[in-house]
Amino acid sequence: MKFAVIVFPGSNCDRDMYHAVKEVAGAEAELVWYTETDKLEGVDGILLPGGFSYGDYLRSGSMASTSDVMHKIREHAAKGKPVLGVCNGFQILTESGLLPGALMRNKHLSFMCHQEELVVEDNQTFFTSLYEKKEVVRFPIAHGEGSYFCDEATLKELQANNQIVFTYKNNPNGSIENIAGIRNKQGNVLGMMPHPERAVEELLGSDDGLKLFKSMIANWRDSYAINA
């Protein structure tokens, strides 16, 4: 499986993501500057890493969401191919309309950087099939605008369609219904605020994130590779 890790001006978790998928999970990966849209041809999975794209001007993820590379990413997603957005990547996905809702300022209005326990709410996804349902995992968080919000109608739709993939055990930022990560209806786009790429080696305090990337690789082999 070949991943493209998209690098925007202000991204700062791109090398963590690259290390996680290539050097730990063993997949093929390339760092792709946001203007190099031609490099997305032939890519199997797209990863939008964390950071502060465009300095978080206007709103977190807002400016990146209008860049040309996002048109390519929409096309990629429309084909059913996987897209993962982490932290700022999640913000970009909501700003671009690939995922519903929005990320707002943390309830205490401060930047948060520590380990958090999450609950795997749905293990029947492209991204979570190697986890157990309701498994508790530990991922780092590092954000100032990570409080997930959506209106009541959208929340009911997320719940009805099993689109809530991860929740916080101890909601650190005020996210509605403790939401830490959601997927689209089709199931091939996942956005989450916690950082699985920073939880792939016990040396860093947890390797719980490794199963997310291995789930992606295993499911790609079972589906896209067979149908290629």
Swiss-Prot record:
Catalyzed chemical reaction(s): N(2)-formyl-N(1)-(5-phospho-beta-D-ribosyl)glycinamide + L-glutamine + ATP + H2O = 2-formamido-N(1)-(5-O-phospho-beta-D-ribosyl)acetamidine + L-glutamate + ADP + phosphate + H(+); L-glutamine + H2O = L-glutamate + NH4(+)
Gene Ontology biological-process annotations: 'de novo' IMP biosynthetic process
Enzyme Commission code(s) on record: 6.3.5.3, 3.5.1.2
Key words, A-Z: ATP-binding, Cytoplasm, Glutamine amidotransferase, Hydrolase, Ligase, Nucleotide-binding, Purine biosynthesis
Active-site residues per Swiss-Prot or TrEMBL entry: 87 (nucleophile), 195, 197
Protein localization: Cytoplasm
Domain Glutamine amidotransferase type-1: 3-226
Signal sequence region: none
GO cellular component: cytoplasm
SUPFAM superfamilies hit by this protein: Class I glutamine amidotransferase-like (SSF52317)
Function: Part of the phosphoribosylformylglycinamidine synthase complex involved in the purines biosynthetic pathway. Catalyzes the ATP-dependent conversion of formylglycinamide ribonucleotide (FGAR) and glutamine to yield formylglycinamidine ribonucleotide (FGAM) and glutamate. The FGAM synthase complex is composed of three subunits. PurQ produces an ammonia molecule by converting glutamine to glutamate. PurL transfers the ammonia molecule to FGAR to form FGAM in an ATP-dependent manner.
NCBIfam families: FGAM_synth_I (TIGR01737), PRK03619.1 (NF002957)
SUBUNIT field: Part of the FGAM synthase complex composed of 1 PurL, 1 PurQ and 2 PurS subunits.
HAMAP family per the UniProt record, alphabetical: PurQ (MF_00421)
The protein's name: Phosphoribosylformylglycinamidine synthase subunit PurQ
Lineage: Bacteria, Bacillati, Bacillota, Bacilli, Bacillales
